[in-house]
Amino acid sequence: MKNFAIIGVGGYVAPRHLKAIHETGNNLIAAYDTSDSVGVLDSYFPATSFFTEMELFDRHCTKAKNRGERLDYVSICTPNYLHDAHTRYALRLGSDVICEKPLVLNPWNLDGLQQVEEQTGHTVNNI
């Protein structure tokens, strides 16, 4: 069983991620979106901690990691222009990443992401 977090849980693609995480028997420990999407989230993971502020989401995930809890994957379901920043954040948090297409808007940003992968030892999976 893997532990997941999701960034952009209020987006139109997020329910597919929630469904996949749920149907494969994994846990969702935290979810973030700038708008309240608890109705969708609650249909799959009613006990998941939900945040509308990135700072609080980050604090929650960091504290969980410091307690020895694994955060295996972060799913990125935000608007395209945020994928690069959120992917870098998740890698630096110490998690592998599942990110919707496109991974970056500008191809030259791929080299930077690859460097962060190498620095952290974690990987990005683009779907």
Enumerate the predicted regions with their spans:
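Beta-loop-alpha module in the N-terminal Rossmann-like domain of NAD(P)-dependent dehydrogenases
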Residues: S49-V116
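N-terminal Rossmann-like dinucleotide-binding module
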Residues: M1-P46, E69
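General small-molecule cofactor/ligand-binding pocket signal
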Residues: I29, F51, N125
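Short, structurally constrained coil/turn elements
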Residues: Y44, R67, E118-T120
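Rossmann-fold dehydrogenase core element
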Residues: G112-I127
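Short, Asp-centered acidic motifs that coordinate Mg2+ and/or phosphate
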Residues: A30, D72-Y73, T123
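Conserved hydrophobic packing residues within short motifs/helices of P-loop NTPase cores
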Residues: A5-I7, I98, N125
